[in-house]
Amino acid sequence: MEGAMAVRVTAAHTAEAQAEAGREAGEGAVAAVAAALAPSGFLGLPAPFSEEDEDDVHRCGRCQAEFTALEDFVQHKIQKACQRAPPEALPATPATTALLGQEVVPAAPGPEEPITVAHIVVEAASLAADISHASDLVGGGHIKEVIVAAEAELGDGEMAEAPGSPRQQGLGLAGEGEQAQVKLLVNKDGRYVCALCHKTFKTGSILKAHMVTHSSRKDHECKLCGASFRTKGSLIRHHRRHTDERPYKCSKCGKSFRESGALTRHLKSLTPCTEKIRFSVSKDVVVSKEDARAGSGAGAAGLGTATSSVTGEPIETSPVIHLVTDAKGTVIHEVHVQMQELSLGMKALAPEPPVSQELPCSSEGSRENLLHQAMQNSGIVLERAAGEEGALEPAPAAGSSPQPLAVAAPQLPVLEVQPLETQVASEASAVPRTHPCPQCSETFPTAATLEAHKRGHTGPRPFACAQCGKAFPKAYLLKKHQEVHVRERRFRCGDCGKLYKTIAHVRGHRRVHSDERPYPCPKCGKRYKTKNAQQVHFRTHLEEKPHVCQFCSRGFREKGSLVRHVRHHTGEKPFKCYKCGRGFAEHGTLNRHLRTKGGCLLEVEELLVSEDSPAAATTVLTEDPHTVLVEFSSVVADTQEYIIEATADDAETSEATEIIEGTQTEVDSHIMKVVQQIVHQASAGHQIIVQNVTMDEETALGPEAAAADTITIATPESLTEQVAMTLASAISEGTVLAARAGTSGTEQATVTMVSSEDIEILEHAGELVIASPEGQLEVQTVIV
């Protein structure tokens, strides 16, 4: 139907006004009657005609002429050549007499579901006038003036609205015995359009049920709390809040919901389940058909047994049936049923769905209706799959009918039905991608897809990020980009426990735990676990380097490489060490700075001694040699004492040692702080000796304690080697100890770079000497 057919429903508040309107119309007063009031209900007007109804019989409501072609029927109505047929018998009820004021002909119901609205009287005069006017506007559409009697009656204490009020014009509800004014629109596709929210519906009955949502009447009252609702379904959903019933359960994470819509939002939300359950189910269901019909817990004598074992990947749909019980009501297994439509040859083999004792059924048809109703209530999407004849075999039953009731075979996981997206993705991955994008280096299988992709680079970008200003051509790309600004890592890997910002990152990371490499290189055939790794590798086969530096004209294949290169020109160092404040141009350099064995040494904390802090360390260099004891209770269980000794003459004539840090990592211990402080305040010519404290202090210090150029660190025997190695680490890996002034009695002029290998040699040699290039400072560590 080309135009739009508008059905305008006008209201009259009395039967006299209705009769007067009919008399003014003359011979064209009544064109058709769509419904007649009956004690048991209402007759209805057939749904609007569409292309699928061309083979149906179309009957004129005025002359009762029948047409098989829709075009002939419409032409017949426009010509106004038909005459009203002789009146037939109408149910003689006071309502019909008062409403119509004359005899009318009831219209036969159409092939579709009738519109269950009240009396509809078609006014031919208004029809002819509106048709001539609407043909110029909507191109041959039809506008009908119909009168709809209000079905709803006002309750006690409610007052009827005045004629023409917004409620009567928009909602179609009026007081008792009155009629409502509603504007019903039928578009060119034959679908009913709601005049308030512009939603479309297939039949008028669905539109009528939808119109209830725009009404203020709430006839369904909760008996527990007194809350009222417009529809019965809303009352049922509300009642679950009192009972805490959660019939809709997620098959991935096990979380239950009260409404099917909540489950659907859970599956489509930004925080869906991260883990898919790999299951291997073996369940025994013991139910007899007789007990299922009667709903009684009979003995096990006449029970049938069925066993079903399935193994495979779960299909991502919502469950229909959750629990399978035996004859005594004991839960045997929780079942997640995947409904699939079988071929005609397999319907005889498919067992019946399980039936709980709480819902006894009297026939096979009622059980199917219950299952179908449960699917509708739970929002199940029925996937159609063509099964093989040998894929399902009936399980043997003992002592009962050959078709056991509760075999959970509707899952059919062995078929492994893939969603359409997965099939398309698998087919697309098999096609070689030989058309790379010159701007982003992404590859495409055809030139057409490449051109469509290029429009994303050159076309308009109306969707901009509010935080960084980056624009995108589509909204979903902006939504995906906004995940970058989220700092919270809410998604955890079930295998290793790592946290990620998005679920897509978790899915990509999970391939690390498997040997699957689904992304092959179209050039060399090398396979990769992630698409990004495959794309990065593919760029190595390309000679193009589209990302050019603006300072030196050097080209790069990846944009990230260009960004890192530009930092060398600008001097930008965005990655700061949280301890020493040193900046780095690349994140990897910062990680290496934090991972090296020496620790971050640029920030040397001054160790102060106070009465309240017995664990603080200090280095005292005074005029007279002395000894300072420092406790470190956090290093080991026992208390260790560090004896530090030096002279004042050397301290007055020397300057502080400068430590040029190479690549050291953090060693968070008191030993490291003391050693750093010693090295920092040691002057030229000092010797640092590590000794055991196995006897009294005088014996432990030995002859080195009397030397004027010696700093002796006396430790317990268990920590001697540890302190010596820590001291060596403090001045190793590229570190140079240098003094700007001072004299030295040493004649050595060699530099020994300490590394892990040198420390191993130190354990065997017993002594290691490290001297500055000019021989200004000597550090000697002795392991006794």
From Swiss-Prot:
It comes from Homo sapiens. Keywords: Cell cycle, Cell division, Cytoplasm, DNA-binding, Growth regulation, Host-virus interaction, Metal-binding, Mitosis, Nucleus, Phosphoprotein, Repeat, Repressor, Transcription, Transcription regulation, Transferase, Ubl conjugation, Ubl conjugation pathway, Zinc, Zinc-finger. Gene3D superfamilies: Classic Zinc Finger. Residues 369-566 are annotated as: Mediates interaction with CDKN2A. Residues 41-85 are annotated as: Required for ubiquitin ligase activity. One of its GO terms (molecular function) is RNA polymerase II cis-regulatory region sequence-specific DNA binding. Ubiquitously expressed. Induction: Up-regulated by estrogen. PANTHER family: ZINC FINGER PROTEIN (PTHR24394), ZINC FINGER PROTEIN 271-LIKE (PTHR24394:SF44). Residues 521-580 are annotated as: Mediates interaction with TP53. This is Transcription factor E4F1. One of its GO terms (cellular component) is nuclear body. It catalyses: S-ubiquitinyl-[E2 ubiquitin-conjugating enzyme]-L-cysteine + [acceptor protein]-L-lysine = [E2 ubiquitin-conjugating enzyme]-L-cysteine + N(6)-ubiquitinyl-[acceptor protein]-L-lysine. Pathway: Protein modification; protein ubiquitination. The keyword Repeat applies. Proteolytic cleavage produces a 50 kDa N-terminal peptide (p50E4F) which has a DNA-binding activity and activates transcription in presence of the adenoviral E1A protein. The major full-length protein (p120E4F) functions as a repressor of transcription. Residues 575-597 are annotated as: Mediates interaction with RASSF1. It holds the Pfam family zf-C2H2_6.
